[in-house]
Structure formats: structure tokens, C-alpha cells
Amino acid sequence: MGRKFVVGGNWKMNGDKNQINEIVNNLKKGPLDPNVEVIVGVPAIYLSYVKTIIPDNVEVAAQNCWKSPKGAFTGEISPAMIKDVGVNWVILGHSERRTIFGEKDELVAEKVAHALESGLKVIACIGETLEERESGKTEEVVFRQLKALVSAIGDKWENIVLAYEPVWAIGTGKTATPQQAQDVHHALRNWLSANVSGSVSDAVRIQYGGSVTAANAKELASCKDIDGFLVGGASLKPEFVEIVNANQ
């Protein structure tokens, strides 16, 4: 069985109720390719609201969570809370969490482990900076990030989607070519095959997340090892529907 295409729209810290209503109406209007799993990453304060208005063919994700079920962690939310409002997904290890908020591989792994134990599905993000790419360290960096996740994931790979986001291609005006993206996805699969198992390598879905737009989505979708996208800014716009449908 082929890997089901999966497109995530990460709204980041954007949207008020009016804008969210517009985005959701656009998703309802679609039409969205029924062979694609669609997930939107929503600011924590709007998770419950979006859950009540989103169409059945779109899943909702939190954009972050902490590594404990409850406690004295002011400003954080737990997987238990996310599940309690009917949400089944969380995005963890996003490059903005790593760079702006200083989250290290080990913390991301602890969060992933706790989210999976709590029954959430996880979009786990990895990716290198411009400096790392220009010093030829792309594979070294993404393999290091992936290695940290392996013990956290254990045997729960069916609840994981990996997202490769070249940090250097986000908001910098530089974009990864489909071939550059495919090369990294292929290398990740080879690493998984060698270090986890052939079956995980074949089955796990790897999204691409580096300035995906309606203009470049089709060509990226045609790459053998790209199984979907994690879309940022474009997920707030009507063109998100085109990106979801890029694999048709």
C-alpha cells in the first residue's frame, strides 16, 4: 500500500475568529482531494473553537505541548488537555520552537515521547539552517535530530509524520529545489532503513516544509520520497486548497 499523502497547514501565531471562519469556509468549499489527509495547526486558544466548525475531512493539531500531563508549568499545555478538547494531533520540534525558543533535540524527543504515550499523533519536525547547509552539514544535522527521536518514538511509528523543513528556505527568499528536497527525503529514508527498519522506512510519511506555495507544490508532490507538505503562510490563504490537491 502506498503512503497516504498528508498536508498540514501550520497557522502559527495567526488568525482571529473572523479570519479563522474565512479559512474554514474555504476548506469546506474545497473541494479537497479525498485521498489526502489534511491537518491544520491551530493556536492553542482556538483549538476548541476550530474543532466545532471544521469539516469532518480536516483534522486539527496543536502547535506545541509540554512533556508532562499537568503541573506547575505556567503558559504550557499538555497532551491530556489537547485530547480533552477532542484534538488528536500535535506539531513538535518546529524550527521556530528550536531557534526562537531554544528547544534542543533532547527536549523535543521528551515531548514527542510523552505526546505519543498520551495517545496523540505527532508531526515531528527536523531541518538544517542556512549556515549548516552551506557548511555541508545537512545530513549530519537531520540525522542527529532524527536519531534523538528514534528512542522517543519506540514502536509508535504509525502515529508519526516526519516533516523536513530546511530552515534556510523559510522566509529567506531562498528556496529548495524539488531535487534538493527529494535528496534529503531519500537520505532520511535510507537512514531509517539502516537504523530503524526497512518497514518503517517504507511506511513513514515525510512531509516537506520550506516555503511551499501553490506554484511549487505540484512539482514537489511528484518527488518519490515526498509524502506531503507542512505549509506555513500559504495555509492562511485560499491557495491552501490547491496545495492539498497538488498530488492529483
From Swiss-Prot:
Entry's InterPro entries?
A: Aldolase_TIM, TIM_sf, TrioseP_Isoase_bac/euk, Triosephosphate_isomerase, Triosephosphate_isomerase_AS
| Superkingdom, taxonomy of origin | Eukaryota
Q: How does it assemble?
A: Homodimer.
Catalysis performed (reactions): D-glyceraldehyde 3-phosphate = dihydroxyacetone phosphate
Which of the seven top EC classes does this enzyme belong to? isomerase
Where is substrate annotated to bind?
A: K12
Q: Does the keyword Isomerase apply?
A: yes
Q: In which pathway does it act?
A: Carbohydrate biosynthesis; gluconeogenesis; Carbohydrate degradation; glycolysis; D-glyceraldehyde 3-phosphate from glycerone phosphate: step 1/1
Q: Which family does it belong to?
A: Belongs to the triosephosphate isomerase family.
Active-site residues, as the UniProt record annotates them = H94, E165
Specify the protein name.
Answer: Triosephosphate isomerase
Its cellular-component GO annotations read: cytosol
Q: Which HAMAP family match?
A: TIM_B
- Give start-end of the signal peptide: none
An example of a GO molecular function for this protein is:
triose-phosphate isomerase activity
